[in-house]
């Protein structure tokens, strides 16, 4: 079996060790000859990489491992780029969340004004990675799971139309895992689903087991009462996530025939979200206080002891979708996966050039979207508004346009008026002066 060379772009991410453990657990179906980390923050990456070096030496010494801040060294001779970058890191996420809340608007990583701000930082970073890949390994594929995926996907569609990049999100996968628990299946691979929408903005219309039995009635009944909180809920799930999974019952009530993506909470119940937010302590603070500290302390312990048992790093099980995607391309498996792709008529009554999240069959040539057909007015109306926001953000970045970004924030369903949008925008510009292009 062919062995592959992979570079993880965003090597200093706290998600990287879990992805390395997941890659090691999947060597039987996706064997590696080389693994490289790339990051523009060398000091941060070094801690993560040195810990991963210990793990790799123990579990797979035959895999050639290196880490670098040099794009040429990182992107030369690779088959896949696995990208999860966060431009501005968590301190800027904190600004994305807290600035809108100061104006009475929800503050969220990928939704509303915060997601727009993050998108304006991410576009340039992801395009830079695409360009490095095309320069140094023109036959490679980029598997991008950097957020905000919807805005990034629109930017790559428009500004790098021929790039071999696939944009994928783990949120539907996480929700499907909970659905499988609710109906008593071993895992989400025991289900066959139909889903459509945009990234962080979609609906399941059909869920069956592999024998073709309809699981929707049982799911509807359960979710109407408990949301996506499964019977044996993981005690380690943070309070903010538990609230999001529980709130799905109210989102689902709007269209009881479907199962919603949890992120719709932010668009359909923004008043609830603001009322239940603490403007002084947002999700970014939770992550910095817990995940960031825990992963880095575990890595330092592993480095000091020279053995992996010294630190508690968890395998990122549901990140196995990244391996599913890579193996589908490498071995032409025609795996069915939810990807963010140009609509091109898959949803009949929706914009052809909108980036939609729908089931695709994946092989050597990338994704082949499955037909969705017509969608109802409710979903179409919501999606049209949100697609317009995403397109305006890319317009703003490309044209360096203050007005386009003001329009984008005004059009967001989370924002009550153009005057509030302008006040938020002006604060975001001040906070992002080191990251955004200068707007005129």
Swiss-Prot record:
CDD domains attached to this UniProt entry: GH4_GlvA_pagL_like
**What cofactor does its activity depend on?**
NAD(+); Mn(2+); Co(2+); Ni(2+)
What molecular functions are annotated in GO for this chain?
Answer: maltose-6'-phosphate glucosidase activity; metal ion binding; oxidoreductase activity, acting on the CH-OH group of donors, NAD or NADP as acceptor
Q: What is this protein called?
A: 6-phospho-alpha-glucosidase
User: Reaction(s) catalyzed by this protein?
Assistant: alpha-maltose 6'-phosphate + H2O = D-glucose 6-phosphate + D-glucose
Can you tell me which family this protein belongs to? Belongs to the glycosyl hydrolase 4 family.
User: What gene codes for this chain?
Assistant: aglB
What residue intervals traverse the membrane? none
């Amino acid at each position: 079996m062919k062995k592959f060379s992979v570079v993880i772009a965003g090597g200093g991410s706290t998600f990287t060790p879990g992805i390395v453990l997941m890659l090691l657990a999947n060597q039987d179906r996706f064997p590696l000859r080389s693994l490289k980390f790339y990051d523009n923050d060398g000091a941060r990456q070094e801690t993560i990489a040195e810990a991963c070096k210990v793990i790799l030496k123990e579990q797979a010494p035959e895999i050639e491992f290196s880490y670098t801040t040099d794009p040429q060294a990182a992107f030369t001779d690779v088959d896949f780029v696995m990208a999860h970058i966060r431009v501005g890191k968590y301190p800027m996420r904190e600004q994305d969340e807290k600035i809108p809340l100061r104006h009475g608007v929800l503050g969220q990583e990928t939704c509303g004004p915060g997601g727009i701000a993050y998108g304006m930082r991410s576009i340039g970073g992801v395009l830079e990675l695409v360009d490095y890949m095309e320069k140094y390994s023109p036959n490679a594929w980029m598997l991008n799971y950097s957020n905000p995926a919807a805005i990034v996907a629109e930017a790559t569609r428009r500004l790098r139309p021929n790039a071999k990049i696939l944009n994928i999100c783990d949120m539907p996968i996480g929700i499907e895992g909970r659905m499988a628990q609710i109906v008593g299946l071993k895992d989400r691979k025991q289900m066959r689903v139909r889903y459509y929408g945009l990234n962080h903005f979609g609906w399941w219309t059909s869920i069956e087991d592999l024998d073709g039995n309809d699981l929707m009635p049982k799911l509807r009944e359960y979710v109407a009462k408990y949301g996506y909180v499964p019977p044996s809920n993981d005690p380690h799930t943070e309070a903010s996530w538990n609230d999001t999974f529980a709130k799905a019952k109210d989102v689902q009530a709007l269209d009881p025939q479907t199962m919603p993506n949890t992120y719709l909470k932010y668009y359909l119940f923004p008043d609830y979200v603001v009322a239940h937010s603490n403007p002084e302590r947002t999700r970014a603070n939770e992550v910095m206080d817990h995940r960031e500290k825990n992963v880095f302390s575990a890595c330092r312990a592993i480095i000091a002891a020279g053995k992996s048992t010294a630190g508690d790093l968890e395998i990122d099980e549901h990140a196995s979708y990244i391996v599913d995607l890579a193996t589908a391309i490498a071995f032409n498996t025609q795996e069915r996966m939810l990807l963010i792709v140009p609509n091109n008529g898959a949803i009949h009554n929706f914009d052809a050039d909108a980036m939609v999240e729908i089931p695709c069959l994946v092989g050597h040539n990338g994704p082949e979207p499955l037909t969705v057909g017509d969608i109802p007015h409710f979903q179409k109306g919501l999606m049209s508004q949100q697609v317009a926001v995403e397109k305006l953000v890319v317009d703003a970045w490309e044209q360096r346009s203050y007005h386009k970004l003001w329009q984008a924030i005004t059009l967001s369903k989370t924002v009550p008026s153009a005057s509030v949008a302008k006040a938020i925008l002006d604060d975001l510009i001040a906070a992002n002066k080191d990251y955004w292009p200068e707007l005129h």
